[in-house]
Amino acid sequence: MAQSLAAALALLLLPAAAPAARVVESFAPASAAAWTPYQKAPKPVAAATGIAFPLPFSKAVDRAAWDKPVALDLSAATAFEIDLACPRPEAIRQFGLYFKSGGGWYAASKPMPGPGLQTLVFAKSDFSTEGSPAGWDRIDGIRLSPWKGEALDAALVLHRIAALDGGSLVVVRGTSSCPNDSERAVAAKTTERVSRLLIEAGIPHSLVTDDDLVNGALNNAAAALLPYNPQPSAPQLKALNAFLARGGKLGVFYGASPALASAMGFKLGPYTKAERPDRWRSIAFDDPVAWLVPPRIWQKSHNLFPVYPGDRNSSVIAFWENARGVRQPEPALVVSPRGFWMSHILLNDDAQSKKELLVALCAHLDPSLWAPAAARAVRDAGRVNDFQSLFHALSEIERRLPHAADPGATRALLDEVRSLSAQIQAALAAGQHRHALLLARRQRQLVLRADAAVQLPRPGEFVGVWDHDGTGYIPGDWAFTANHLAAHGVNALFPNLAWGGCAHYPSKVLPASDTLRLYGDQLAAVLAAAKPRGIQVHVWFVLWQLTGAPDDFAARMKKEGRLQIDAGGNTRPWLSPHHPANRQLVLDAVAEVARNYPAIDGIHLDYIRLPDSQSCYAPTTRARFEAATQAKCRAWPADVLAGGKRNAEFRRWRTADITALVADIRAALRAANPNVKLSAAVFGSIQPDGGNIAQFWPDWLRAGSVDFLTPMNYTESSAEFSSLVRNQVAQPNAAGRIYPGIGVTADESRLDPADVARQIVLARQAGCPGFLLFDLSGTLRDETLPALRQGLTRPTPP
């Protein structure tokens, strides 16, 4: 018999080591008067363990703000943590953090994660500048600025702002080692990705550029990462070689320098491009247990700079595998006494596994990094769903045990979680940080499994999955995908089978894609596999984008003036939705699919909008706008740009033009096959004039132009997700027509199974008949869907 909850949880209250953080504001209750209200914000007051900032958001205000003078040097900080709590997080649309520096500000904002005590993390790369700040080393003020969400009063209690300063690890952003602006942009994005994963893992690090190398940027470092620095200059190579000579360790991703590879004991192979998109799909270690990494790390790479052992002291530790799990000849990772080398950059798929990979590789370079990584893993072990601690998680899961299909088995998981707490504390006390990390990861996985098990299923729920590649898990094997999805409760599949300039099925309207040539008719194949298993098929159209289009098709579109043109007169590789021929192309493509494949359940529109405010200012757009408004523009596009006298009128017109196109698609679809439903992926937020993207989907619902919508509510904040869904279902004619999109592996969000479960529950509470998961991936296959099947999507008795 398990011991009592109170006694068992006592171990969970033992203090755990935390990653080093420099507190820059403690919010001592007695210091409330030091915060000056900005404009008409109420005065803050002392709280039990912090300062409470009243939020008068039932009034007609956009935000509240408070300032405090400081004198801080934050130049060494890589990120900032803020501990705060709000019982009504829906009152806050975004929490803004501002650092004043001379004549300007560093500004950033994020949504509240949820109710109760939360920790917001701001990377330095999250901050933009306003005015002309003097530098991070001269911070003379802090401003807190919650922006109004829902119209209700609340209080926000702040407890701490801490700076996460760099340590023995340096991350080097590629600048002059990149040959052009495009490559430098890739380097910046890749470096930011690596830094964020390190921050989440608790690994302290500094950020420099490769231009800083010659100025001694690595003088105090034990290890350095080069996330994408393809061609270091001779002076940079000299600095890197000097760093290696004094015992420093390097981790290189997708390097193109044979000299640097040789200096590290490796041999660089030639640039290699995959002849098939399923060639390199995952990384598999020879000994994942020894390296403390998952058995398989998902990554869809399309090109490599293969690297091989160069001497007897270097070796391969991981290889690439294809979509079927077959090992490929190219090594993914090699190591030597001087560091490691990966044959591609670190992409953004499978974020949790990538984080564990980075911890292992960085600790290989500098074993002292096991300690902060273990401390973070211990802290985060119970922070799943909206739980604030391990104690909170176990208390809530214990309360919900009767909901589990097998309460006894779920209770056993909780008992193991409790027993692990004592082992973790013993390991930390003995300085066994690597072992403590392993135990904390195990503990978190058990909490995730237990949380999944106590979720309730809902019979008849629409459970959909987007497939961005349009080829299933394994190209050429739709049966495998359909079997797996059906076995895990998925009853609707949205494969991406058509783009602006190509199709994955035979078409007389759109050119053939490479996917069609390699794997055959994907629409026929998915229908044959999915329909017998009770899975609906909604054909996903990505409109306007020419990704994958043959060169001759794109050239013809440009010659015919059918591409979008920005305000500077530059052509963009997108078809213009305002061009009559492009609109007809969409109508013909939709009708063709509906006629030729009558077994489909729906047509799903994506990018049924403009990409941004930079499009479209082509001559055809001007002609149609002037004809519709019966007024010529004297200065084009100046008249319709922001600040122009006809800007508001133009924004309304472009939005109405998209709305009219949706109605035309509906009419064409009804004529071709009245049994096929029409849906669309839309932005979650609603702008009255359609915003920069010209998309006001409430009008589509009001007119009955769509059967349902799938708002892309891609956020890691349960509070923001809940607010979005409640607003969406409140729109006229929206009842039963909102199927929220959940960003499991979206660029904007990376969700573990508990995060996904929480958002599904919130969608149910708002009255939604179902949901969609973005998107089909190894993470979805191995983690998300199996977890959901334990509770939320488990079979129910008839």
List the predicted regions and their residue ranges.
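Extracellular ligand-binding interfaces
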Residues: 54-133, 138, 147-157, 162-165, ...
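Extracellular ligand-binding/catalytic regions of CAZymes and related secreted enzymes
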Residues: 166-171, 193-197, 225, 328-422, ...
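Helical hinge/lid and interdomain linker segments adjacent to catalytic or ligand-binding clefts
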Residues: 179, 183-264
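Catalytic domains of carbohydrate-active enzymes, especially glycoside hydrolases
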Residues: 197, 201, 477-502, 598-599, ...
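A glycine-rich, often tryptophan-bearing local segment used as a flexible ligand/cofactor-contacting loop or short
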Residues: 230-303, 310-316, 321-323
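Substrate-binding cleft of secreted/luminal carbohydrate-active enzymes
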Residues: 443, 705-721, 728, 734-798
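Active-site-adjacent "subsite" loops/lids of carbohydrate-active enzymes
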Residues: 460-465, 523, 527, 538-597
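Glycoside hydrolase catalytic-domain groove-lining segments
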Residues: 628-750
